[in-house]
């Protein structure tokens, strides 16, 4: 609440009973002021303050999902938002459709840049009620403002996205575009994951930059990247005979949902990416299927409602 600098004879005694003077009252103390201070037993004062704020094993973070891509990613944020909401998270969403805080659009998008920027992302995180956040990030917002978070739980990339309008930042070729979009994967936590499109050649090198797990998705189980990933025990999502399957390691793939169910609300890449993102956050395949069915039946992609399923 405040930091008080005091000079007195005995700090462990009542100040009103001794000579003392208040040198400074800091209404917004900086934790870094305590970082160089140690107690008699050698413990850092700053560490003690942090330990008192969070229980053992907790770091105060909520799941943060970033997603990027081109036209194939339209509706992706709404699908992830719906699945996390129905999994029990109070979820915020910053997308091209606007800013949605726990199932209520508080800012409909009149200008896309105003709801997919740093400020919109910070609004997702600042609410104490929000338990998970889904944010669209693109090259322009990264270049002009940076990411609204320091680390994320999941980064989803269906493609590098369009390069239009980036010339003023000297982003004139695929290599420079890659260097910008890698940022979203660079900040994934070690216990997080990146969901990447294995059919996009431009995304393949980005997997090496992720500190966490990689979940590939592809339009066919015969994709070479996906096949090698399964041989190494990894998780993946793919399309086969019009059905989206999920698979882990060399175990047989399991059918999850038909692409025809999406009725054009999501592209194949978007649907697989959304499933991979939810799976990365340990949403069970059964709940993913139920969430998507409810999402499609109630028209969440067009008009997310206040309906919620507790689990």
Residue ranges and their predicted role:
Residues 81-84, 140-149:
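Short amphipathic alpha-helices and their capping/turn segments at secondary-structure boundaries
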Residues 51, 78, 82-86, 208, ...:
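Short, well-ordered alpha-helices that flank and scaffold nucleotide-derived cofactor binding pockets
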Residues 56-105:
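Walker A (P-loop) phosphate-binding motif
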Residues 128, 144-310:
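Acidic, Mg2+-coordinating active-site environments of NTP-dependent enzymes
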Residues 21-23, 133, 194:
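Protein kinase-like catalytic core scaffold
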Residues 6-14, 70, 199-202, 292-296:
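A glycine-rich phosphate-binding loop feature that marks nucleotide/adenosyl-phosphate handling sites
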Residues 1-66:
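ATP-dependent carboxylate activation and anion-phosphoryl transfer catalytic cores
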Residues 100, 104-145, 157:
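Conserved nucleotide-sensing/catalytic segment adjacent to the nucleotide-binding pocket
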